[in-house]
Amino acid sequence: ISMLFKMLPMLPRIPALSKMSAREYAEGFQHLGIREILKTVVGSDYNAMSLMFTLATLAAGDGGYPEGGSLSMAHRMAKHYEDLGGEIEYNKRVQKVLVKKGRAVGVEISDEEILADAVVVTIDTLSAIDHLFDQPLHEPWMEKMRTNTKPVMNTFVCLGIEADLSDLPENMLFTFDPPFFYAGEQVNSLSVNNYATYKGYAPKGCTSATMGLMGDTYDYWKNAKTKGTYEQDKKQLAETIIERLAAKLPQIKDKVAVWDVATPLTYERYCGTYKGSWMTVVGKGDKPSIYPSTSEKIANLYFAGQRLQPPGGLPVAVVTGRTAIQYLCRDTNTVFQGSPPL
């Protein structure tokens, strides 16, 4: 309750901030550096309220990222699940959910049927309802998701640098004049994550660095794949970024030993997400929708994942998993028990 009282002064501003984009809010600052930094926090297309929530979370010390990244988080969850007696079958991609007489009865993997009492679909919901069943599913909330979803996409660039950058900040923002172009997008600035002080990210004396270029470039990369220029286009982008960064950081010139470029097609292949998107834009004037974890037409079918509660993110994905299991327990007259690992 005391926390709610502290938030009261902010409440009158929420409607106005929700109707303004993060870009528009950032443009209100005179200092170029502040404007560019604010544009990179949540993405320019989000509403300004999303920016406020993110900044408040960080300022309160209540936000961060999983140690080792999302993959390490998934590995830890998998280990805990297996320690509890659960079984995981790796390197097997589900082709479709089996439905008989209006009930989900299992999944098909490479022409092998695995029967189950219930199925919880955790792949991107938007992708699942279109591709994981004999026919695309059509329910009111699914149609709403198809219509309203504004996918977040990026092209992610990673560099392995044979230089110790531990004397530099963990995050740096560089502006470019003139800008450079890739996949039809103009890049005026670049936010660089510097992992020099993180153990295990690079050999001793070396540095791993990453940067995300936001923008819907799915169709461009898809076309490049079709034309056969995909790998060359990725190489050209990496070389452009390396050249531009070397002009800002002379100590990395000729020191980049390895690079990797992940496009929306990479995310699509690796994670099975809709157009390779990993979150949903909540733009100005948008009212975030919370979608059901169950199907109205198919029994024993449950959904979980970041797409169910825009804008998404790892915490949302975990929460929706918990919700799906609570529905499963309700439907099977099972008492839901949840406790943190000891």
Tell me what each language-model feature is.
Residues 93, 99, 329-342:
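Active-site-proximal substrate-binding core of FAD-dependent oxidoreductases
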